[in-house]
């Protein structure tokens, strides 16, 4: 793999999509193509307004409409002509859990759901995909986006579980519970440099001030390296 100098670092604003009715009901959305609700549409505009202060030159999105709508709002605010669908950013395939609450999943198979909650490296959603596979494709997607946009700043819109899995891969066990609070409409900033993904900011709700949006730098975070 060819290396790039620091000037070719790509900064990725990884945005969680806005709220949907299923988010409000705390149900697994998975691959269901549910629309943003009124709150989610407002969050999309908030994200677009906040990121309008950043020199974003490209916008990527999960193919699901709730993410694309946020990506479109960001692209319009930045004058970016196209939102690029990226299959690696799509949500976890929850299989039989899709549409259920956590309580319903736990009641159906307590051991399997305990693994999901406590040991994502081993968890596999029944009839769906493993969290390890979801994590691998998310990291691959972010690295691919970073390589394609060396020296630039971009936005990518994905889903709560996918953002959490990316943070877990970079930070490791130091984050504790991998299902940490991640509000809809929030952003987490990553960078890709020399084929590595690093975490720049903690999780923050988007704000117009770029210094506030960047948050506190995590300079010594472990990194996921492209294979």
Residue ranges and their predicted role:
Residues 1-11, 94-104, 147-152, 168-227:
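Acidic, low-complexity terminal tails and accessory targeting/binding regions
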Residues 13, 19-74, 124-139:
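Loop-to-helix element that buttresses phosphate recognition and phosphoryl-transfer chemistry
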Residues 160-164:
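GST superfamily/GST-like fold recognition
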Residues 50, 73-77, 144, 148, ...:
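Active-site catalytic microenvironments for nucleophilic, acid-base chemistry
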């Amino acid at each position: 793999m060819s290396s790039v100098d620091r000037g070719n670092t790509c900064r990725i604003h990884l945005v969680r999509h806005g709220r949907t009715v299923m988010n409000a009901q705390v149900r697994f959305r998975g691959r269901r193509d549910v629309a943003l609700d009124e709150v989610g549409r407002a969050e999309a505009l908030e994200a677009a307004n906040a990121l309008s202060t950043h020199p974003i030159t490209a916008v990527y999105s999960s193919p699901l409409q709730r993410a694309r709508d946020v990506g479109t709002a960001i692209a319009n605010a930045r004058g970016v002509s196209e939102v690029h669908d990226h299959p690696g950013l799509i949500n976890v395939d929850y299989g039989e859990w899709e549409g259920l609450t956590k309580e319903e999943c736990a009641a159906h198979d307590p051991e399997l759901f305990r693994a999901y909650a406590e040991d994502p490296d081993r968890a596999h959603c029944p009839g769906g995909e493993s969290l390890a596979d979801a994590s691998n494709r998310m990291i691959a997607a972010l690295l691919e986006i970073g390589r394609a946009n060396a020296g630039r700043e971009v936005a990518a819109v994905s889903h709560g579980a996918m953002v959490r899995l990316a943070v877990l891969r970079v930070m490791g066990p130091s984050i504790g519970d991998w299902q940490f609070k991640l509000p809809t409409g929030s952003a987490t900033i990553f960078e890709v440099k020399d084929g590595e993904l690093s975490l720049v900011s903690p999780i923050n709700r988007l704000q117009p001030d770029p210094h506030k949006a960047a948050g506190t730098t995590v300079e010594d975070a472990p990194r996921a390296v492209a294979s």
